[in-house]
């Protein structure tokens, strides 16, 4: 690869300020919401603690319900009945992973959206 091509790619990457998840732009990568979302993406499938954390911290800062819904459809979470102790059993974990849901199917997420819609 020629040095000029390498430099060009570097400058293109430096000027890129948004990330993408399944074709969905993630705001500006310096924002708290984006850092939280990036961490959530890396932590998938999301545990109950992650789901609560996203609802408590991230959702309170994002005003676009449409954006929240799109992001929730892309994130995978454990069903609400899964506990940390269940995940310590390998065979059970394999079975549970076959039953992952999207975040927008999670009962806590739906409750949040109902409350969000009333505001």
Swiss-Prot record:
Q: Mind telling me which InterPro entries this protein's record contains?
A: Capsid_sigma_1s
A Pfam family: Sigma_1s
UniProtKB keywords: Host G2/M cell cycle arrest by virus, Host-virus interaction, Modulation of host cell cycle by virus
Q: Which GO terms describe its biological process?
A: symbiont-mediated arrest of host cell cycle during G2/M transition
Organism domain of life: Viruses
UniProt similarity note: Belongs to the orthoreovirus sigma-1s protein family.
What protein does this entry describe? Protein sigma-1-small
* Organism annotation: Reovirus type 1 (strain Lang) (T1L)
**Which gene holds the coding sequence for this protein?**
S1
